[in-house]
Design a protein with these regions (language model features):
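Amphipathic/hydrophobic helical signal segments and adjacent flexible N-terminal regions
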Residues: 2-45, 98-100, 115-145
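Central antiparallel beta-sheet cores of small beta-barrel/beta-sandwich binding domains
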Residues: 27-102, 133-137
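Basic, alpha-helical nucleic-acid-binding regions used in initiation and control of genome expression
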Residues: 112
Length: 145
């Protein structure tokens, strides 16, 4: 009888720990304070501001630098629009971008991890993809401001 109670109690503790872990893993939501601001990487910058109701105002500017016999050159690209966010991940399609363009913004560990699929029309070799670091939490100035 004593062994049965011990097994039962052990199973209940394991089940409780599993449920708590599952909840912690699935609750990856971020606050406006965590997403708001200016994020930078070597070749690009995102300006992001929470609008409420799971929507973000987003503006991207990127550059691809290269050397030519005439000297250094650069291709530049920009995109702006609204993104929808669920938990820690936002989906952004810049206004006027190709249909297959999709930019995924994942806010994780104090960083912004960006993946890009499709042609987004930023310019030759200009991509939003990369890991960005927050450089300011202030409300950014957007091109439309």
């Amino acid at each position: 009888m004593k062994a049965t109670k011990l097994i039962y109690i052990g199973a209940m503790c394991f089940a409780s720990a599993s449920i708590a872990t599952s909840r912690a893993e699935s609750d990856k939501s971020v606050t406006a304070a965590q997403v708001n601001g200016t994020w930078k990487t070597k070749g690009g910058e995102f300006k992001i501001w929470a609008l409420g109701k799971q929507r973000l105002q987003v503006e991207f500017s990127g550059v691809y630098e290269y050397k030519t016999p005439q000297g250094p050159m650069a291709n530049e690209g920009v995109g702006s629009g609204a993104a929808t966010i669920e938990n820690d991940t936002a989906i952004f399609k810049p206004e006027g971008a190709e249909e297959e363009c999709q930019i995924t913004l994942k806010f994780t560990g104090g960083k912004l991890v960006v993946t890009q699929t499709g042609i987004c029309g930023f310019g030759h070799n200009v991509s939003a993809e990369g890991t960005y670091k927050k450089v300011s939490s202030k409300k950014p100035k957007f091109g439309s401001d």
